[in-house]
Amino acid sequence: MKSAILVFPGINRERDMARALQLASGSEPAMVWHADTELPKGTDLVVVPGGFSYGDYLRCGAIAARAPVMDAVRKFASDGGLVLGVCNGFQILCESGLLPGVLMRNARLKFICHDVHLRVERSDTPFTRGYNAGQVIRVPVAHGEGNYEADEETLQRLEGDGRVLYRYCSASGEVGEAHNINGAAASIAGIVSERGNVLGMMPHPENHVEAIMGCTDGRGLFAGLVEHLAKAA
């Protein structure tokens, strides 16, 4: 798997993501600077990592979405390439038009930084094939603006098309207000594009891939991507 990680000023999770991808694929990802206008030839996966691109000025992800490299990412996605955006990366994908909706301030207006439980809603996508449908996984979050919102028509379309891949839940998989950490509509933690090739999620699976981290539940996402791309080759 040949992956490329975008790097913007203020991003701080690119090395964590590189470690997770390297462990899963055995290949070192390429780092792509925000001012570049092309992706490396043969790229299979583009990752937009977490952090605080451009200091979160204007809106989270708003400036990064207009960086030169994003034109290449939009073209890559329109051609069917796989794109993963995590935390600030999710915000950037929404701001760039690759995903619908917006990430708002957390409902309690506080920065959240701890492990959460997610329910995997389906297992037949490149981003979830490493899990079972209904499986509960534990991954960290670290955000102040992770409250996913969209208009009612968009939310109905996301639900009807099965495009919600991850939801906040309890340790036993129960979804509800008590387990919705940031107030996100329908407890949404991660969604995919219409074609299913672009995923945005607020939690950080890359931070739970080694036993020394206390949990390895994030491995499934990366292992599934490697398996999908190997079969598609």
UniProtKB/Swiss-Prot annotation:
The active site is at C87, H204, E206. Keywords: ATP-binding, Cytoplasm, Glutamine amidotransferase, Hydrolase, Ligase, Nucleotide-binding, Purine biosynthesis. One of its GO terms (molecular function) is glutaminase activity. The keyword Nucleotide-binding applies. Pathway: Purine metabolism; IMP biosynthesis via de novo pathway; 5-amino-1-(5-phospho-D-ribosyl)imidazole from N(2)-formyl-N(1)-(5-phospho-D-ribosyl)glycinamide: step 1/2. Residues 3-233 form the Glutamine amidotransferase type-1 domain. It catalyses: N(2)-formyl-N(1)-(5-phospho-beta-D-ribosyl)glycinamide + L-glutamine + ATP + H2O = 2-formamido-N(1)-(5-O-phospho-beta-D-ribosyl)acetamidine + L-glutamate + ADP + phosphate + H(+); L-glutamine + H2O = L-glutamate + NH4(+). GO terms for cellular component: cytoplasm. GO terms for biological process: 'de novo' IMP biosynthetic process. Disulfide bonds: none annotated. Its EC number is 6.3.5.3, 3.5.1.2. PANTHER family: PHOSPHORIBOSYLFORMYLGLYCINAMIDINE SYNTHASE SUBUNIT PURQ (PTHR47552:SF1). Part of the FGAM synthase complex composed of 1 PurL, 1 PurQ and 2 PurS subunits. Part of the phosphoribosylformylglycinamidine synthase complex involved in the purines biosynthetic pathway. Catalyzes the ATP-dependent conversion of formylglycinamide ribonucleotide (FGAR) and glutamine to yield formylglycinamidine ribonucleotide (FGAM) and glutamate. The FGAM synthase complex is composed of three subunits. PurQ produces an ammonia molecule by converting glutamine to glutamate. PurL transfers the ammonia molecule to FGAR to form FGAM in an ATP-dependent manner. This is Phosphoribosylformylglycinamidine synthase subunit PurQ. The gene is purQ.
